[in-house]
């Protein structure tokens, strides 16, 4: 897939396209081969596209490669920008065992009443 000829105006890069569509294998391949030496605003944009489209595994993959998960936390404090619920913040704030329980609840669109206030960085 080359995006240099008929560039999609919604995406600045193939990484942004792959992240926003949840193509985890492509995201991992790009990050492993190219690295993450992008400008900070591009990091934020790629992470936000994945978040807005609810690709949680892709988000975790980006975070594991150095993308800043506080971008999502900051996004959730500004609800005018995107209509999201606090339940998605839990994904980034939970320990591993709690994360799997919460992720299952999110997939089933169930509300989670408790939030752990510790970041795993």
Curated annotation (Swiss-Prot):
Q: Which SUPFAM superfamilies match?
A: Ankyrin repeat
From the Swiss-Prot or TrEMBL record, give the protein name: Putative ankyrin repeat protein L215
Q: Where are the ANK repeats?
A: 10-40, 42-71
In the UniProt record, does the keyword Hydrolase occur?
no
Keywords from UniProt, A to Z, are: ANK repeat, Repeat
> What InterPro entries does UniProt report for this protein, alphabetically?
Ankyrin_rpt, Ankyrin_rpt-contain_sf
């Amino acid at each position: 897939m080359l995006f240099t000829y008929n560039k999609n105006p919604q995406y600045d890069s193939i990484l942004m396209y792959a992240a926003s569509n949840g193509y985890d294998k492509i995201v991992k391949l790009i990050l492993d081969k190219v690295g993450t030496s992008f400008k900070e605003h591009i990091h934020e944009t790629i992470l936000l596209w994945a978040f807005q489209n609810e690709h949680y595994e892709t988000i975790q993959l980006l975070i594991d490669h150095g993308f800043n998960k506080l971008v999502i936390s900051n996004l959730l404090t500004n609800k005018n920008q995107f209509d999201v619920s606090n339940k998605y913040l839990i994904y980034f704030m939970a320990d591993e065992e709690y994360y799997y329980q919460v992720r299952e609840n999110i997939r089933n669109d169930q509300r989670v009443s408790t939030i752990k206030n510790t970041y795993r960085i």
